[in-house]
């Protein structure tokens, strides 16, 4: 199967990436399912054991490493999950990525602030008995393959001095996207991939999202003169993504 640019494929991402050439994309930005029981359709179980889930992520990121060009970067949006016990997914992924061969380049704290809503999951209310922290942040973990520098023509950089100064800070304050409005259980805001794409790629670069979902990464690529490749196992979400791109 030939994988073409500016296309979203309704297939499993591991199978899709195995059809890609080595060293064929400049940047990967994605947010894998968090394994918290969300309904992604019958094609995917979001409530596996931790071991099964981490094995799935490892297989996915191994293929990401293979298709990423030397000097390319990958940005992974993830959140820690659970209460009993609390599961530090960001820590598991950091260790996993180093073992695969990626170089850690830092992490961005996505401060979701007031947009996360008035959660009442605080454990023991006003008591030291068993209070629970309410996460109002997620992580964007940044890694690179091989060379620290991504080669490109500086004239094809599309980030302003003001934005560069802001985006290189390790805390980003952004609201969340509405699942109801978008039509997907866990969309990230368009601002997230747009910032990453402008910070880490040149105009004309190829960006891969192995968990394309509602197509937000592809829309960001269209807005910013980048090429995209996406995989999405759910046919309804794939059609939603294609419709969003057509409306741009």
PLM feature spans:
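C-terminal helical cap(s) of enzyme catalytic domains, especially alpha/beta-barrels
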Residues: 238, 242-248
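Core catalytic lobe of class I
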Residues: 1-240
